[in-house]
């Protein structure tokens, strides 16, 4: 239940998030704003957003694991 994710899993999740955000932003820039498809601004912003998702997701999973552990311990003590 409280399985630690390996560094390799976290790295792949970060790369997948950054790629998905980058593709979405690049399509938006190209279609709606008429900018270059492979701009550095889009790449940097997608890396930033992926980092935010990475840290928020890590905190979310650690908090949810603590809640599950407490509820499991409380049910055992009754």
Swiss-Prot record:
A GO BP annotation? bacteriocin immunity
Keywords, A to Z, come to: Bacteriocin immunity, Plasmid
Its recorded name reads: Colicin-V immunity protein
- Function of the protein: This protein is able to protect a cell, which harbors the plasmid ColV encoding colicin V, against colicin V.
